Amino acid sequence: MSTGFFGDTAKIKYEGPESTNPLAFRHYNPDDVVLGKRMEDHLRFAVAYWHSFVWPGGDPFGGQTFERPWFKDSMEAAKLKADVAFEFFQLLGAPFYCFHDADVRPEGRNFAENTRNLNDIVDYFAKKQDESGVKLLWGTANLFSNRRFMAGAATNPDPDVFAFAAATVKTCIDATQRLGGENYVLWGGREGYETLLNTDLKRELDQLGRFLNLVVEYKHKIGFKGTILIEPKPQEPTKHQYDYDVATVYGFLKKYGLENEVKLNIEQGHAILAGHSFEHELALANALGVFGSIDMNRNDYQSGWDTDQFPNNVPEMALAYYHVLAGGGFKTGGTNFDAKLRRQSIDPEDLLIGHIGGMDCCARGLKAAAKMIEDKALSAPLEERYAGWNELEAQKMLQGGFSLEEIEARVLKADVNPQPKSGRQELLENVVNRYV
């Protein structure tokens, strides 16, 4: 039954590239077959509950611009928000959604009340999922908004805050499992520091390592089959976050023995904040064996903060999905739109239009990436570039068959004097542009 929030809007359909209808897909056709799989099954789109239904449209210089009938802290409002959200998922044809606990339940007076409220709304969500067929991609706990977390959650100097956060995560994993969620995400927005003057780095990292081990232990104890994901971000709200980027998180996982238990949820905007490209973070996660899922958005390249806009750069998306596909595609992960409307975009249909554009952009990127893979447009030059390493002596050198002295002797005996070869960067950039 319609909530009336989106008026008489019909389900969004694919109308093809020539369509000028703003409420239609031009490139995203869920049933299109790409590399032997339906487009919907490749992309696994999800809607972010927080940006789409919780964010009020404020900024540091002004407050709420969005007027939503569910902007009240009550269970009745939470259920209305759920009604609108699930109507939106179905209008859009999004197969998944994601949420923080604080997005979906009213804030209670204490942990017990928060848990009761979460359990109540999970009951409601379970019915909504059964009715709609929409699934939960991942759940997570908001361990950054409430003032109790101002000095961190797992890394807080107060052990009671650590305990409160751990208990909260336990209830959120329970909720995620009950709703059939395919992943559970941890993002450490307050796990870091503002100044080293009041920070014990080793202590805080050890606390964070123990916290994550508790999560993994509990996952196995209850038989949760989903993937535990960490989402890297270098800063904001904290000046320096411990989950800075893919490389940093991998080092952390190795130190605490978790590299085979935890994978990464990589966000485009966070990659930019860390001084990387999106494809760099994806390629590195694949190389290290920790790629899990993506949060799709974009940042304003002239701003120094996380603007969380909808993606609109097809070449960027093509390279991103190239690395997703090259790594074998999503397993339990997907494409979550961690993107929000601009604060002047106050109409309900703006929410649909933003997601439609993002989904079309991703679809174009996916198709371009798939074609590059089919044609070996990038893989063939790469194989040629490293072909020398396939030779017997090179393999022996790489696998420990020669000592440093033996390598020196070979260089002297054979008078090895290598000459440089072109990296052909401009050619490869032109190749990519042919596909997008």
From Swiss-Prot:
SUPFAM superfamilies per UniProt: Xylose isomerase-like
Cofactor: Mg(2+)
Keywords of the record: Carbohydrate metabolism, Cytoplasm, Isomerase, Magnesium, Metal-binding, Xylose metabolism
UniProt-annotated location(s): Cytoplasm
Gene Ontology cellular component list: cytoplasm
Residues binding Mg(2+) 2: 267, 270, 306, 308
Active-site residues, Swiss-Prot/TrEMBL: 100, 103
Note accompanying the cofactor annotation: Binds 2 magnesium ions per subunit.
Binding, Mg(2+) 1: 231, 267, 295, 338
Catalytic activity: alpha-D-xylose = alpha-D-xylulofuranose
GO molecular function (one): xylose isomerase activity
Any one biological process term the GO annotation gives: D-xylose metabolic process
EC class (word): isomerase
Family: Belongs to the xylose isomerase family.
NCBIfam families reported in the protein's UniProt record: PRK05474.1, xylose_isom_A
HAMAP family: Xylose_isom_A (MF_00455)
Protein name in UniProt: Xylose isomerase
Organism name: Sinorhizobium medicae (strain WSM419) (Ensifer medicae)
